[in-house]
Amino acid sequence: MRADEILELVNGPAVLDIGCAGHEVKPDQPGWLHGKLRERFQVTGIDISESNIAHMKSLGIQDIHVQSADSFELGRQYDTVVAGEVIEHLSNPGQFLARVRKHLVPDGRLVLSTPYGFSLMYALYAANYFPKTCANGEHACWFCPTTIRELARREGFEVEKWRLIDDYDPSVTSRKYRLYWKLIHTLGKLLPDKLTKTTMLIAFKCLS
């Protein structure tokens, strides 16, 4: 699960979770990243959705705030900033990275995941629905290892670790979604990860 892969890269104790609600607030789901982070670390969360933050507060979740990922200001620094499936939604990814850097302690870490646009799954989706190439209409851009590395370098980060992972969500009941994943899983036994994995997971550190 993506959340478990992200957790392996997080250093504490202080963690900022950007986009903390996820697509939906799912505290009862094992893959809900914000819940997993709170089990291990001292976590602050921000999300642009007022309704999702209100819902989370109604569940007793504290230290969460309605703020935008590319303009947030919290007045403190963190050991790790986590941004799971956020950067592809933003109008200004570079400005987002600049805000993250301001909120990291020296030698702090940014852990980021984003769809890998050259995955076979996305190629199959595009072939089926072209000119629509992405199921999520709120995505504004695609990244690959080269482009995300260069963008990060321009904003004062360097890559510490990266890998390609799967992002299968067992809570999705769509028959077509599950058929896609069954096909990808089968092909994954025959083809390299660079063709079958769907998500990039990267840990960055601040350049001195």
Task: Walk through the language-model features, giving the residues of each.
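A short beta-strand submotif of the Rossmann-like class I SAM-dependent methyltransferase core
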Residues: 83-86
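Conserved alpha-helix/loop element of class I SAM-dependent methyltransferases that forms part
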Residues: 1-13, 28-33
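S-adenosyl-L-methionine-dependent methyltransferase catalytic module, highlighting the catalytic core
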Residues: 20, 70, 91-208
